[in-house]
Amino acid sequence: MQLRPHQQTALDAIASNSKGQVIIPTGGGKTLVAIKDAVRQCEEGRKTIVVVAPRILLARQLCEDFREYVDAKIFHCHSGYRGYVGGTNPEWIAQWHDHEKDYNRIIHTTYHSLHKLQEAGIKVDTIYFDEAHNSVQKNFIEAVEYFSLYADRCYFFTATPKHSLTPMKVGMNESDIFGEVICKVPAPKLVEQG
């Protein structure tokens, strides 16, 4: 898998930071950056990686994208049709996680079901938040903040970061949760690169 220069810059930023925001315009290949990082992580040894998407359909699509490159056991934590082992019962999630301890594991979930992984109490090595502007919603922020604190590595991918200027509402400008912007690719740069 060959990365374009801006994707390699993003991958290097991820390798140098345990948490942060990766801002790349739509169509810029954010998913490939996450996949390449996941491949590198899994080559190091047994890892648990979580991929969070805003919708079940996107979780399934991301699963197929990751599965093409990453050798790992797959679990889906959401309420939709999965085609893989899955469910939202925290005990079942923890049992699956423990049962597959000799393998790399990737868990695909949605923002709506992320709290079920929190309740399962599993150790997460890396978590990727796709379309991370969704993570600031009040129904999701508790689980997002939990994994921001307890996952070893935590990355927020978006084309459109959502900031807040009021203390009553969480925004991606809260670096204690979302980290700093570790890579920002302007749209004209993508056009330059073709």
Model-inferred region functions:
Residues Y84-I107:
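Conserved motor-coupling elements within RecA-like helicase/translocase cores
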Residues K101-A143:
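Conserved RecA-like ASCE ATPase "motif II neighborhood" in helicase/translocase motors
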Residues L57-E91:
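Conserved helix-turn-beta segment of the N-terminal RecA-like "Helicase ATP-binding" lobe
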Residues K47-T48, D102-I106, V124-T126, Y150-F156:
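Loop/turn-to-beta-strand initiation segments
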Residues T31-K36, C42, R46-E68, H163:
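Conserved Walker A/P-loop ATP-binding site and its immediately adjacent core
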Residues N17-D37:
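Walker A/P-loop
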Residues H133-Q193:
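Post-DEXD/H (motif II) to motif III coupling segment of the RecA-like Helicase ATP-binding lobe
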Residues M1-I23:
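Conserved pre-motif I regulatory segment
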